[in-house]
């Protein structure tokens, strides 16, 4: 039986991933951890502990004590926040990954690791439309630089030590269950909360800032499907492109107005606009589709409907 450790279980991805993993593997076999308290359904639905991934000694004791066989390492300083504390963000993002890689190298029981990369690995010199799996990666953000370095490290550990690390270059992720957490694509979460609360939203990106996005349910399924795929089917051991759907704030606002006709949006781009300008507008994910059968359920219309329903329910409106 798999014993799974999720690091960063209080975050946007982790809080929903834990729920899905517990459905698949049994609640008692999925250990949720974070440096802060997680949502109630994570804490009450199975084992939860406060754990700092930067504390290597405590980490190895936890893994051995609970006979961990898989690790999902999701803890990170995200793109917008990383620009405010560049050296600290680099240190946290890289040292935490190296702690996990060294642990997986030394502990034979650990068979697989998941670590998320991001479209932030791309930069201004990358082809912006239908960005290929193999292309120019010259990121110009702290977050992107750390993700690109991480991609090289996970492939190195696979080739040198046989550590089976799997990774997805996530696009912007959209969920109503946890509010935004300092990322450049977080407008696509904030907009729904403000639409329901206030009937208007001030976007920190321009109206034509088209970016790849993905509804969280699709992202969680893709993550677990990749981890469950046969190793022999995987043609790469760095990080897979995953496209989701591409839209800009103007298009998303128009979709919201179909449900809330009086909704208004204004545009006041901040420092995150420059980050968005350096990222792809659309992604080619044909390699992921060929290797492990990547599929999507949500387009922009379905995503908008479910987000508005979910936010209203969460806010009790």
Regions of interest found by a model, annotated:
Residues 98-141:
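Conserved Rossmann-fold NAD(P)-dependent oxidoreductase catalytic core, especially the SDR/UDP-sugar
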Residues 146:
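Active-site helix of classical SDR
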Residues 117-118, 151-177:
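Conserved beta-loop-beta element that borders a ligand/cofactor-binding pocket
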Residues 4-23:
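N-terminal Rossmann NAD(P)H-binding glycine-rich loop of SDR-like oxidoreductase domains
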Residues 122-123, 141-142, 166-186:
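Flexible, glycine-rich beta-alpha linker
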């Amino acid at each position: 039986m798999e014993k799974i450790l999720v690091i960063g279980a209080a975050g946007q991805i982790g809080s929903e991933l834990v729920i899905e993993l517990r459905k698949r593997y049994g609640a008692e076999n999925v250990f949720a951890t974070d440096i802060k308290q997680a949502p109630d359904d994570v804490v009450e639905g199975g084992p939860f502990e406060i754990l700092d991934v930067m504390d290597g000694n405590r980490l190895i004791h936890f893994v051995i004590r609970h006979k961990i066989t898989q690790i999902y390492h999701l803890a990170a300083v995200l793109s917008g926040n990383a620009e405010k504390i560049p050296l600290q963000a680099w240190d946290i993002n890289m040292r935490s990954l190296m702690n996990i890689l060294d642990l997986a190298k030394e502990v034979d029981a650990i068979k697989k690791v998941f670590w998320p990369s991001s479209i932030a690995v791309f930069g201004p010199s990358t082809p912006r439309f239908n960005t290929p799996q193999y292309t120019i990666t010259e990121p110009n953000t702290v977050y992107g630089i750390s993700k690109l370095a991480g991609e090289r490290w996970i492939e190195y550990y696979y080739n040198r030590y046989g550590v089976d690390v799997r990774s997805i270059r996530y696009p912007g992720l959209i969920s109503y269950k946890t509010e935004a957490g300092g990322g450049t694509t977080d407008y696509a979460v904030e907009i729904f909360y403000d639409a329901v609360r206030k009937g208007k939203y001030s976007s920190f990106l321009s109206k034509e800032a088209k970016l790849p996005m993905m509804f969280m349910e699709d992202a969680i399924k893709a993550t677990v499907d990749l981890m469950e795929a046969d190793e022999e089917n995987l043609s790469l051991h760095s990080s897979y492109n995953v496209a989701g759907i591409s839209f800009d704030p103007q298009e998303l606002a128009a979709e919201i107005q179909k449900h809330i006709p009086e909704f208004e949006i204004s545009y006041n781009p901040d420092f995150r606009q420059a980050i968005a300008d350096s990222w792809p507008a659309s992604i080619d994910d044909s390699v992921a589709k060929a290797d492990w059968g990547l599929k999507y359920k949500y387009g922009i219309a379905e995503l908008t409907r479910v987000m508005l329903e979910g936010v209203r329910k969460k806010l009790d409106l």
